[in-house]
Amino acid sequence: MHLKKERTFVMIKPDGIERSLIGEIIQRFELVGLKLIAIKMVTATPEHVEEHYTLDPEWRRITGEKTIKGYLDKGLTPPSNDPLEITAKVLANLKKYMSAGPVICMVWEGAHAVKIVRKLVGSTEPLSSDVGSIRGDFVLDSYQMSDTDGRAVRNLIHASGSVKEAD
């Protein structure tokens, strides 16, 4: 594939739609010169969510380990030291969150599309997102608040982490 034709997958999550941020989010990608190739609004089922987030067999282990590390970095005790047990809880919360309303699925194309989109989106942990990123500018949630409430973090958007993942 030609470098200028690199594609990436982006999904605006239910909270982004609920807050009417669709146009703002799309504009951010257009302003850097990316081309919108496909767009579709769908309502995800819990099964769709599980398929989407767990295609990589390492995802469950890595997610659990990152979650445990996040607790420890904050001086908190994780609810479990078993990464797979932690991920099961994360996935259950994610299924509820992602199937609570419609999502917008998009494919964007352009040079270095994956890296550019990841920079524009910001860190998955909203409090770590830089000002100027989508999450840094519009998300008021945090891992700590979502953990306290027993729910998934509301971070507006999903973006593929690699060309392989985007495919």
Q: Which ranges hold each PLM region?
A:
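Non-catalytic terminal and connector segments of soluble metabolic enzymes
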Residues: M1-D167
